[in-house]
């Protein structure tokens, strides 16, 4: 599902809200989540999951085009850990 599909679905479920209002709300929520992570804070949505930052240590990589070794700096990357309720809902189809 893309962001525009999410907005379309939410606007359909909430007929009293315009698609523009839903779009602004979704954008604001995602911006706030990104800002929170950028500040080094963790986000927890009970039953859904949590978002945090994981540190990737510096390492030696390779340029896929030339095969040359490249030194990659350490960096933080976003990480999502699904909650139990989400894991259970997703795994309902494997039983």
From Swiss-Prot:
GO terms for cellular component: chromosome; cytosol. Heterodimer of an alpha and a beta chain. GO terms for molecular function: DNA binding; structural constituent of chromatin. Keywords: DNA recombination, DNA-binding, Transcription, Transcription regulation, Translation regulation. One of its GO terms (biological process) is DNA recombination. This is Integration host factor subunit beta. InterPro entries: Hist_DNA-bd, Histone-like_DNA-bd_CS, IHF-like_DNA-bd_dom_sf, IHF_beta. SMART domains: BHL. This protein is one of the two subunits of integration host factor, a specific DNA-binding protein that functions in genetic recombination as well as in transcriptional and translational control. It holds the Pfam family Bac_DNA_binding. The lineage of its organism: Bacteria, Pseudomonadati, Pseudomonadota, Gammaproteobacteria, Enterobacterales. It comes from the Bacteria. Belongs to the bacterial histone-like protein family.
């Amino acid at each position: 599902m893309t962001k525009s599909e999410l907005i379309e679905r939410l606007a359909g479920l909430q007929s009293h809200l315009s698609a523009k209002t839903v779009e602004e709300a979704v954008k604001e929520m995602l911006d706030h989540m990104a800002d929170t992570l950028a500040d080094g804070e963790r986000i927890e949505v009970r039953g859904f999951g949590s978002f945090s930052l994981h540190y990737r240590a510096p390492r030696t990589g390779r340029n896929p085009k030339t095969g040359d070794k490249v030194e990659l700096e350490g960096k933080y990357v976003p990480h999502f850990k699904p909650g139990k309720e989400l894991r259970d809902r997703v795994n309902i189809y494997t039983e």
